[in-house]
Amino acid sequence: MWLSDVKLILADRIIENGALRSENGVIAEIVESAGQPSGSTVFPGFIDMHGDMIELELEPRPKVDFPMDVAVGHLDARLAAAGVTTAYAGVSFSRSAKDGERRSFEHTSAIIRALKENIQGLRVDHRIHVRFDMTYTDAIAALEGLLVDGAVDLVSVMDHTPGQGQYRNIENLIGFRMRGGKSEEEARTEIQMRMDSALPVEKLLGNLQNVSLLCLAHGVAMASHDDDTE
């Protein structure tokens, strides 16, 4: 099949008016075109390395849950329509989440299972990006279980302790928690508890080393996330 008289966005250059031939879903030939440009553009599929969208698809409003298969199917259609061909679903664990709530061990594991179970029927190459907060020591065991099961494609580490890094402004963080469904009192209490229980640097580095060794052992790429650059 030929796509002719289109603008082609390639890895090393742009062909303003070209033609592309595909065979069995694979690009077989790219040439210049002498025809009248159609105004259409062909570009490589986008890769989304960090998508927060899966959690909102499942729970668009606090305590309003969509069925897993419906949410995953809807997300897949939206990503494909936007030109995203590989999407890393960002999932994480929260120490403040109760059983079954967003970012609890149960909820996050269910998200991963839903993606893995529906993978054959989806348009987009869906992968799992686990974001590990170095302050949450108890989550290491859960992460290890997912790595052993081969359910994780990327791990990033971060420190979301309030008062530094991304959450330097406490009032902004309180507002963010309130938009997620918590009252101001609940948000302030939760944030103060996190600040009071902040881990010493030695413990943070120990958690980082343990997670690094797990990723190395299972051949999973590792990255940093929300670094403090000031």
Predicted regions and their residues:
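Divalent metal-coordination and catalytic microenvironments
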Residues: V6, L20, G25, G39, ...
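N-terminal metal-binding scaffold of metallo-dependent hydrolase/deaminase domains
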Residues: M1-S33
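Short, intrinsically disordered, charge-balanced linker/junction segments flanking boundaries
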Residues: V26-A28, D226-E230
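Metal-associated gating/positioning segment near the N- to mid-region
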Residues: S40-A110
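Short amphipathic alpha-helices and their capping/turn segments at secondary-structure boundaries
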Residues: E32-S40, A71-A81, I140-V155
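Metal-coordinating catalytic core of metallo-dependent amide/deamination hydrolases
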Residues: S94-A97, E101-D227
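Mobile, glycine- and charge-enriched loop segments
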Residues: H50-D52, E59, L214, G219-A221, ...
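Active-site-proximal flexible loops/turns
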Residues: D12, E55-E59, Y136-D138
